[in-house]
Amino acid sequence: MTNDKEADERQSFIAEARREQIIEATIATLDEIGYVNASLAQIAKRAGISTPLISYHFSDKNDLINQTLTTLLSEANAYVTERLKEGSTAREKLRIFIEARLAYQGTHSKHNVALIEIVFNARTPDNVPYYKLSDDGEDPVVYALEQLLTEGQASGEFREFDIHAMASAIQGAIGEYLADQYLIAIVSLETYCAEIFEIFDRATKADRR
């Protein structure tokens, strides 16, 4: 029984490693040739495996794309939420949030391109573009941002404002940089990050008069 269990665990580990390899190849393919041209054959080529092997781990291209999207979002979310633990005040957490969101994408450009390719090109079985879908659940990063804004108001660090509106504005400013190649070319990540924090630091700061 022990040998059978060890064999099963080894097979499970190998299968998971192969799935991760295929997802990484999918990210690279989306970055290099875009969603429209990202066939299973192209993905297999970059993974260094046969095309049928992908079908062993994923039911079809849509399944692979959805799993890749889940991976992209979970990795980015984990990075930001882990960094937020470094802050002790709401203001510090706001700075860290902005820095972390921008820094992660700045150091994971392929992941950012792959995410954009999926969101703006993939469709549901009902032919609805992914970017038009409403969120079924709470986004961990948005939740973390709204929580730190709420904490800031409760502690008196931040003025009174609508939490959802402010969180949306902050997310929008971050997303604008990540999606605008011209802006990226003329404004450094560090400069944009500093300016965005300055803007929202002033926008959220409590009136001390």
Residue ranges of predicted features:
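Short hydrophobic clusters on alpha-helical segments that form packing/core surfaces
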Residues: 18, 22-30, 101, 200
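Hydrophobic alpha-helical connector segments
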Residues: 67, 71, 81-111, 166-170, ...
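C-terminal peripheral helix-coil segments that are non-catalytic and often amphipathic
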Residues: 1-6, 96, 103, 139-155, ...
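Amphipathic alpha-helical packing segments from all-alpha helical-bundle domains
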Residues: 74-77, 81-82, 107, 114-117, ...
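Short coil/turn segments at alpha/beta junctions that flank glycine-rich nucleotide-binding fingerprints
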Residues: 32-36, 87, 108, 155
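Generic hydrophobic, amphipathic alpha-helix propensity
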Residues: 18-26, 43, 68-72, 76, ...
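Helix-turn-helix
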Residues: 21, 29-63, 67
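Helix-loop "lid/cap" segments that line or gate small-molecule binding pockets
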Residues: 83, 99-106, 116-124, 153, ...
